[in-house]
Amino acid sequence: MFYGLLAAIGWGTSTTTAAIALRRARSHIVVLFSQAIGVVFLVILAVGTHAPLLSVAGSAVVALVWAGLIGLLSYLAFYQAVAIGSPGLMSAISSTYGGVAAILAVVLLGERLTGLGIAGVVLAVIGIVLAAAGPGTPAPAAAAPTGPGAAVSGRVRSGSPALAVSLALLSAVGYGVGGYLLGEYSQRSGWLMPGVIAHGTSVLALAGVLPLLRGRNGWRGLDLATLGWMAVAGLADAAALAAYSRGTQIGQVAITAAISSIYPVIPLAFGVLLLGERLSRRQLAGIVIIIAGLVLLGMA
């Protein structure tokens, strides 16, 4: 449970800082730079902890490469959804990945959840949907870009709400499948190398297709502040992934995934503490339900 909470904090921080960077840079640039920073962090962590570099079997490497590719598509889908839809609603939809990973873990890994565990997972998912899908806030693309990055972003993008929801649902399924694969192979091959392989695959794949993407020259005009936000997003994401992997190694994938999926609460907390925002009754009810779910998961 502890590592699931750490993962939630890390991914919540990453989501917040990436959203700031998205105001000034294109989504694929944010993903590539932040993921590259994350890989460097994970490699340094692996070397520093003397993680066995050859502990991952060939079949596991193939599965983790797929996990990395699925994760990359999920990141791109989510960031595009946030760019054209309500960030809160998109985060709420995407965060249901915990339920997807939990179902896969029960069906494919044979994990067993007690009645309290099942109730905790259900409450956590319901609570985060209520908490994150509160009053809509302007999407990053809806606000006029500021700073040197404004020249990079180009025209404000617009999109169908249905498209945004579809992309968020796609990211939820992708995150769930990727989270399940990462959890399964963290149990088999240690908690660091699977993340290095999956993250590394994402970076190499995106770097390979970058020349084919529209706006591939989006690096021009990026200021240090934007690069800094992207770096923080990458470090927080990698730290969250390491915590998630460790949690699934020593505990259950289903429970760790469900707990980590409460990450959208972190941006809400930043808004309340730093910006003086007020939570709606729906959001407060969602947070109470999340806490109840965490208590049940702790008792499971």
Show which residues each predicted segment covers.
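Membrane-interface interhelical linkers
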Residues: 1-10, 17-29, 33-64, 75-84, ...
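Structural signature of hydrophobic alpha-helical transmembrane segments
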Residues: 1-11, 55-71, 113-126, 190-204, ...
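Hydrophobic transmembrane alpha-helices of multi-pass small-molecule transport proteins
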Residues: 42, 103-106, 116-135, 143-151, ...
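Hydrophobic alpha-helical transmembrane segments in multi-pass integral membrane proteins
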Residues: 42-53, 101-116, 173-187, 236-251, ...
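Hydrophobic/aromatic residues within transmembrane alpha-helices
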Residues: 21, 30, 81, 107-113, ...
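Alpha-helical transmembrane segments of compact multi-pass small-molecule transporters, enriched
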Residues: 36-42, 93-107, 201-205, 240-241, ...
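C-terminal transmembrane-helix exit sites in multi-pass transporters
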Residues: 78, 99-119, 129, 209, ...
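Transmembrane alpha-helical core positions of polytopic small-molecule transporters
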Residues: 11-12, 67-75, 97, 172-176, ...
